[in-house]
């Protein structure tokens, strides 16, 4: 059977799979997928024909990986850990770090099966299994990149940002942050929301599938997707009865790539009333 066929068949009987009962073919298939996700050869989601496509069988392999290993001691410099998933950098040498070309600041944690591209900087942060972090991206202090999340090139995830995963609670599709996006401090993007290329999300903005994303120029309301080039802040919209307001994210303006390249992030956010 093909790698995908083995994974699909195993997922159908996942409740029966334990570290003691898993057969060799299934274990090898799962571990092969994790290795290919780790190297960036496979991605849980990718853009095909201009649209994001989720490879569900790869996500299933990530889920299955939790079924085939017992918890074990993991050495972590000043302490120890006890988990089923190995750490990505456990066997890295100085030459391998140099070859792969990214920086990892002490206390940053990346699980095996996550891909980190060249010129990335990982401050003390957390990147979960199956995630993809594109070239030139900064994952700032206390930011978290959830399981299978897809982060584009030249993205800045500011301090304390949370990008949701697919494992807990179980989600159909990963959260996606497009190329050249800025996600402000303490913001959360979860539940498979897609933030398209070149967006600027202000600090403290929370976006899930049920969050109304209101475009103040057009009056249009989006769900689950922030259009390319949007500058977004937190806000509220009045209820139908007019007695209260409910949270929303507000698109205050649109910028193209040229403007984004010339104008600082702070300037874009300071001029939202124009």
UniProtKB/Swiss-Prot annotation:
Keywords: Acyltransferase, Amino-acid biosynthesis, Cytoplasm, Diaminopimelate biosynthesis, Lysine biosynthesis, Repeat, Transferase. Pathway: Amino-acid biosynthesis; L-lysine biosynthesis via DAP pathway; LL-2,6-diaminopimelate from (S)-tetrahydrodipicolinate (succinylase route): step 1/3. InterPro entries: DapD_Trfase_Hexpep_rpt_fam, Hexapep, Hexapep_transf_CS, THP_succinylTrfase_dom1, THP_succinylTrfase_N_sf, Trimer_LpxA-like_sf. It is an enzyme of class 2 (transferase). One of its GO terms (cellular component) is cytoplasm. It is found in: Cytoplasm. Its main location: cytoplasm. One of its GO terms (biological process) is lysine biosynthetic process via diaminopimelate. One of its GO terms (molecular function) is nucleotidyltransferase activity. Belongs to the transferase hexapeptide repeat family. Homotrimer. HAMAP family: DapD (MF_00811). This is 2,3,4,5-tetrahydropyridine-2,6-dicarboxylate N-succinyltransferase. The gene is dapD.
